[in-house]
A protein has these predicted regions:
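Ubiquitin-like/PB1-type beta-grasp interaction modules and other compact soluble beta-rich domains
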Residues: 1-79
Length: 80
């Protein structure tokens, strides 16, 4: 099972702060996103959304999610 954590506005889109996704085997991030509601999957693929896998920011391209992974989706931050 992988834990998905949604921060900022992404939590609003998801409707929950986190969710668990059962994985039978290592799964490409793109395939994992297909398991989610379309609106959420689209928001998570935004060009400025960053991903932290097990606490380390990583690139989405080629990412394979394994059982026990935690993926935190980080929205763009603005301020002044």
């Amino acid at each position: 099972m992988a834990k998905l954590v949604f921060l900022g506005r992404l939590e609003d889109v998801a409707g929950v702060p986190h969710m668990d996704c059962p994985l039978a085997e290592p799964t490409a991030l793109a395939d994992l996103l297909l398991m989610l509601p379309p609106q959420l999957a689209e928001a998570l693929q935004g060009p400025r959304v960053r991903i932290a896998r097990n606490g380390v920011v990583t690139e989405a391209a080629g990412l394979v999610v394994e059982d026990g992974d935690e993926l935190a989706f980080l929205p763009p931050v603005s301020g002044g």
